Amino acid sequence: MIMDNLKENHINTEYIVTVPDTTTGTAHITLAEGDNSIIVIAGANAKVDKNVVDNAWSAIEQADLVMVQNEIPIPTIEYIVRRCHEANVKVLLNPAPAADLNPEWLELATYITPNEHELS
C-alpha cells in the first residue's frame, strides 16, 4: 500500500528495501496540554544496516544533503555520517528520539536539529 502510494506520486522507490515478516516503522504522537508524547515502533527501520547504505551509496553520494534521525540503529547513523563526511556530502542529523550519541562522530554532521528534549 505505501509503495503503491509512493509510485503513484512519482517518488523514486529504487532504494526502498522490503523486509520480510517485518512491519513498517511507525510513530504514534499524542498531545495533551501542549506537551507531546511519541511512541516509536521501529519495525523495518531497525533493520537498516551498513549493507543497505552501501547498496544505495551511488545515490547517497550524489545528494546535496542527507537527513538521518535516530529511528534507525545508531551504528548505522554513525556509518552514514562518517561516509558522507569523507565524501563531502552534507548531513542533517535530527537526533530524535533522544539517545546518547558519540560526540566524536556527532561533530561530523553538518547540521544538527535537536528539540528541547534532545538538547538536554
Task: List PLM regions with ranges.
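Conserved N-terminal subdomain of the carbohydrate kinase-like
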Residues: M1-L65
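Conserved beta-alpha-beta core of the PfkB/ribokinase-like small-molecule kinase fold
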Residues: L65-S120
